[in-house]
């Protein structure tokens, strides 16, 4: 008997999430602008001892630190292994397989769909409007059996914030019916748009956060769920007994210190400078059709198809993120904002590509 006969049926047909690292793992690239990572390493002193002992399930000092940073109470915070685990925890906690649904609005982050499929939960994909805002009328019409709505804010890969009044309308219409999950993985690049303070007014609001982006700790795998205490208590029934290792807690606490937060704000300021410069320069490239506005550490760019930008740059060692298969994103690439030198090298490569195309 084949071992495949023992696997769950939905796993056999599951299309796994193609992370930037998985896609680009075999490349010899030297400029990695595909994973929305911070382009330079951060340095922390590992102070953990007693590694022979299991860590606390939810280290109180870490919860206190992140609560202070996010402007919520410690009992409204749950620490997890990146925001991706938060996505899965919510589905495992609130959705009955083969009965309930989740809803999301493409083009958006692909893990919402993959996580639902992994656990045998159906999904409803409501395409965003042309300006990548929520199609509220269609969402309202599709709420039957929907337990969770995932809204990415700012949205990945488009880089725009979602209209706060639309989020509030969605919260009002789903009260007592559906949990609204707002994924704020990139909110540290535009903190004034955060709705974390709304948790006190909406018991069905959940917010996802991470240290992977602005805090430059993608390799640490540390994220947070912000929600009312009743939701946190339910999630604690489902989460692994020791989700956050002592070294992760150690480094995360340093990142959330006064000094660490100051360093993060400096990184965000540097990214803003590089992003604004790159927007101006890309707009002058003849291979570029549209540079979409962004408040994050990445840009969505539509290229003229005849330049074959993704493949051409890949061969030269510059790795971008292809978004061509996403709804409404034909000929689009997502470009992580790198160092000033990486941005300059990218621009030089695009200009060279343009020259070659003109000669042909």
UniProtKB/Swiss-Prot annotation:
Modification N6-(pyridoxal phosphate)lysine occurs at: 213
Matches recorded under PROSITE patterns: AA_TRANSFER_CLASS_2
A Pfam short name: Aminotran_1_2
Keyword Amino-acid biosynthesis attached: yes
GO biological process: L-histidine biosynthetic process
UniProt-listed InterPro entries: Aminotrans_II_pyridoxalP_BS, Aminotransferase_I/II_large, HisP_aminotrans, PyrdxlP-dep_Trfase, PyrdxlP-dep_Trfase_major, PyrdxlP-dep_Trfase_small
Cofactors named for this entry: pyridoxal 5'-phosphate
Recorded catalytic activity of this chain's protein: L-histidinol phosphate + 2-oxoglutarate = 3-(imidazol-4-yl)-2-oxopropyl phosphate + L-glutamate
Enzyme class of the recorded protein, top EC level: transferase
Assigned EC number: 2.6.1.9
Keyword tRNA processing among record annotations: no
GO molecular function: histidinol-phosphate transaminase activity; pyridoxal phosphate binding
Pathway(s) the chain acts in: Amino-acid biosynthesis; L-histidine biosynthesis; L-histidine from 5-phospho-alpha-D-ribose 1-diphosphate: step 7/9
SUPFAM superfamilies according to UniProt: PLP-dependent transferases
Keyword line: Amino-acid biosynthesis, Aminotransferase, Histidine biosynthesis, Pyridoxal phosphate, Transferase
Annotated signal sequence range: none
Cited PANTHER family: HISTIDINOL-PHOSPHATE AMINOTRANSFERASE (PTHR42885:SF2), HISTIDINOL-PHOSPHATE AMINOTRANSFERASE-RELATED (PTHR42885)
Subunit architecture: Homodimer.
Entry similarity comment: Belongs to the class-II pyridoxal-phosphate-dependent aminotransferase family. Histidinol-phosphate aminotransferase subfamily.
Protein name: Histidinol-phosphate aminotransferase
Organism the protein comes from: Baumannia cicadellinicola subsp. Homalodisca coagulata
Gene name for this UniProt entry: hisC
């Amino acid at each position: 008997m084949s071992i495949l006969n023992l696997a769950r049926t939905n796993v056999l047909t599951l299309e796994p999430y193609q992370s930037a690292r998985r896609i680009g793992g075999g490349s010899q690239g030297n400029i990695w602008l595909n994973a929305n990572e911070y382009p330079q390493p951060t340095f922390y002193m590992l102070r953990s001892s007693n590694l022979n002992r299991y860590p606390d399930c939810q280290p109180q000092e870490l919860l206190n630190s992140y609560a202070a940073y996010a402007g919520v109470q410690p009992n409204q915070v749950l620490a997890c292994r990146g925001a991706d685990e938060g996505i899965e925890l919510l589905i495992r906690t609130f959705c009955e397989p083969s009965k309930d649904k989740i809803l999301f609005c493409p083009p958006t982050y692909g893990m919402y769909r993959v996580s639902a499929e992994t656990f045998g939960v159906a999904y409803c994909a409501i395409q965003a409007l042309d300006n990548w805002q929520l199609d509220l009328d269609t969402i309202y019409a599709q709420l039957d059996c929907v337990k969770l709505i995932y809204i990415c804010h700012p949205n990945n890969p488009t880089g725009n914030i979602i209209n706060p009044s639309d989020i509030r309308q969605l919260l009002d219409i789903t009260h007592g019916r559906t949990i609204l999950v707002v994924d704020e993985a990139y909110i540290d690049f535009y903190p004034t748009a955060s709705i974390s303070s709304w948790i006190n007014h909406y018991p069905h609001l959940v917010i996802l956060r991470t240290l992977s982006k602005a805090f430059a700790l993608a390799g640490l795998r540390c994220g947070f769920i912000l929600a009312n205490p009743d939701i946190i208590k339910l999630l604690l029934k489902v989460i692994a007994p020791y989700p956050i290792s002592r070294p992760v807690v150690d480094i995360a606490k340093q990142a959330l210190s006064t000094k660490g937060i100051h360093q993060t704000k400096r990184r965000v300021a540097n990214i803003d400078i590089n992003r604004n410069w790159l927007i101006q320069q890309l707009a002058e490239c003849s291979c570029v059709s549209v540079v979409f506005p962004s408040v994050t550490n990445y840009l969505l760019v539509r290229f003229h198809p005849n330049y074959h930008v993704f493949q051409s740059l890949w061969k030269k060692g510059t790795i971008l993120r292809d978004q061509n298969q996403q709804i409404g994103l034909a000929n689009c690439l997502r470009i992580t904002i790198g160092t000033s030198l990486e941005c300059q090298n990218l621009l030089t490569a695009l200009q060279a590509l343009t020259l070659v195309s003109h000669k042909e």
